[in-house]
C-alpha cells in the first residue's frame, strides 16, 4: 500500500449506520444461517465451506505470509469459474485474528460487494461497504461463539436433542462483541 492510498483512507468519510441499516444486516445474516440449515457448532472456516456448498459459490482459503503493512485478509474474485473467490489471510497472526479476517471477507461476499461491479478491489470499497463487512464478521463471530456455548450446555443436559434453529443466538442483543 503506498502513501497515496493511506491518505485516501484518511480522507474517506465516516459511515454512521442507522437502526434500520443495522437490522437489515442482522436479518441478512440470520436468514442465511437459517436457510443453510446449520444445526451444529461450526468454526468460521467450516462456515465458509458450508456457505460454498449451499450457494454453489467456490470460496477458497489461502494462508500466506503477507507484508506487515498489508491487509490481514483480502478477497480476489475470479472471472473463471464464475462465482469463485479466493480469501487470502495473514499467516503471521493469531488464529482468532485470522478467523476474524476471513469472516470480514466473507461479509463482503455475503453482502454482494463484489457482485455490483466487476473488478472491485479493496481500495474501491466505500466506508458503508467496510462497515457492513465488519458488522457481518462480528455477527458471525458472535454466532459461532454463542452457538458453541449453547450446544455445549445442551449436550451435557440432553445429549440426543438436535438444535432446531441455529440462528437463535443471533436474536439475543446482550453480550455482543
Give each language-model segment a name:
Residues 1-177:
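Active-site hotspot residues in diverse enzymes, especially metal/ion-binding acidic/histidine motifs
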Amino acid at each position: 500500500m503506498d502513501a497515496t492510498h493511506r491518505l485516501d483512507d484518511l480522507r474517506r468519510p465516516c459511515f454512521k449506520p442507522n437502526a434500520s441499516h443495522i437490522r437489515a444486516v442482522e436479518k441478512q445474516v440470520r436468514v442465511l444461517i437459517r436457510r443453510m440449515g446449520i444445526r451444529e457448532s461450526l468454526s468460521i472456516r467450516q462456515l465458509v465451506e458450508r456457505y460454498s456448498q449451499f450457494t454453489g459459490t467456490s470460496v477458497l482459503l489461502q494462508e500466506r505470509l503477507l507484508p506487515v503493512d498489508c491487509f490481514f485478509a483480502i478477497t480476489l474474485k475470479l472471472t473463471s469459474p464464475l462465482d469463485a473467490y479466493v480469501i487470502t489471510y495473514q499467516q503471521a497472526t493469531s488464529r482468532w485474528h485470522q478467523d476474524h479476517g476471513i469472516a470480514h471477507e466473507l461479509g463482503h461476499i455475503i453482502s454482494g460487494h463484489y457482485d455490483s461491479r466487476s473488478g472491485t478491489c479493496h481500495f474501491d470499497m466505500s466506508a458503508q461497504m467496510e462497515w457492513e463487512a465488519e458488522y457481518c464478521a462480528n455477527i458471525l463471530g458472535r454466532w459461532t461463539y454463542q452457538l458453541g456455548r449453547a450446544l455445549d450446555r445442551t449436550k451435557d443436559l440432553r445429549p440426543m436433542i438436535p438444535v432446531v434453529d441455529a440462528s437463535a443466538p443471533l436474536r439475543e442483543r446482550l453480550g455482543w462483541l
